[in-house]
């Protein structure tokens, strides 16, 4: 079981604070976490934590933050195929009351072309749409090789249309629907019209809807994590993507309802922890979340 992930990497600095300073004010945060970040990157770490052999093609810098990122990947036995940038990208994440504000500093001025790997050795490819040229190349190569392709559609990007035509599973956010000016149900039809086999829209605390090639729309509610246990919702969607991929790779013939049920429990675990790394689930944590918060399996 192995998968290739293609996306943009960050170092996330997450801080819990009751007051956001302004002007010349200073405040002290209640807690903080420093971790890896990025949509496909966090999904890759999730898959690795769940025992999947994971390769990652992502941006990497030579500065000390880039070195720290590579050490994180090494800790989880993730093989990295770096695309060089001058500086590591940063995200400052401020979670509060079930929401999260994010301020990013991104370096996407690539100093090297992306590596062209043989995708035929993988069982799945997951993209977040970043590294536009690499995303298009790899999704087409995977389709030609018969490798399952998965897209995290957090937002419309310049390459989204081209990528969708070679995507098997597209799980998009509400923001994606809003950019299209479509309802969630209309977005499912939009995705299927472009050849997507499994189309899904995540709706936060309301859960998700999805449909397969027969067009039948199904709903899966989110597990109810009490407000007092919700610490940091950032990265929960990325963990969701990584978990459904892990579930699929373990049992490709199982229904997608099973894969998505597994993934929602993984997300329920994540939101109880500060930062992406602390929130990575293992199978025991996913089972616990199901039992505690009302999962079916």
Where are these regions (language model features)?
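Active-site metal-binding loops of divalent metal-dependent hydrolases
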Residues: 9, 130, 239
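Conserved beta-alpha-beta core of the PfkB/ribokinase-like small-molecule kinase fold
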Residues: 123-187, 207
């Amino acid at each position: 079981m192995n998968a290739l992930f293609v996306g943009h990497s960050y170092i996330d600095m997450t801080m819990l604070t009751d007051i956001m300073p302004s002007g010349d004010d200073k405040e002290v945060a209640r807690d903080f976490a420093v971790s890896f970040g990025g949509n496909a990157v966090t999904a890759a770490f999730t898959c690795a934590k769940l025992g999947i052999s994971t390769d990652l093609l992502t941006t990497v810098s030579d500065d000390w933050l880039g070195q720290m990122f590579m050490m994180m990947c090494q800790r989880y036995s993730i093989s990295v195929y770096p695309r060089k940038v001058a500086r590591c990208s940063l995200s400052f994440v401020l979670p509060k009351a079930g929401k999260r504000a994010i301020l990013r500093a991104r370096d996407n001025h690539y100093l090297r072309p992306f590596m062209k790997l043989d995708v035929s050795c993988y069982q799945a490819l997951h993209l977040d749409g970043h590294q536009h040229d690499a995303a298009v190349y790899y999704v087409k190569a995977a389709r030609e090789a018969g490798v399952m392709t998965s897209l995290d559609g957090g937002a419309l990007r310049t390459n989204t249309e081209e990528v969708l035509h070679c995507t098997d599973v597209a799980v998009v956010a509400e923001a994606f629907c809003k950019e299209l000016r479509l309802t969630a149900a209309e977005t499912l039809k939009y995705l299927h019209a472009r050849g997507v086999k499994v189309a899904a829209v995540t709706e936060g605390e309301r859960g998700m809807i999805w449909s397969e090639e027969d067009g039948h729309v199904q709903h899966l509610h989110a597990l109810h994590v009490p407000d007092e246990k919700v610490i940091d919702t950032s990265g929960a969607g990325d963990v969701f993507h990584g978990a459904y991929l892990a579930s699929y790779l373990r049992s490709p013939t199982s229904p997608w309802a099973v894969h998505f049920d597994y993934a929602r429990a993984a997300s329920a675990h994540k939101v109880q922890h500060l930062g992406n790394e602390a929130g990575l689930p293992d199978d025991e944590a996913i089972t616990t979340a199901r039992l505690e918060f009302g999962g079916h399996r």
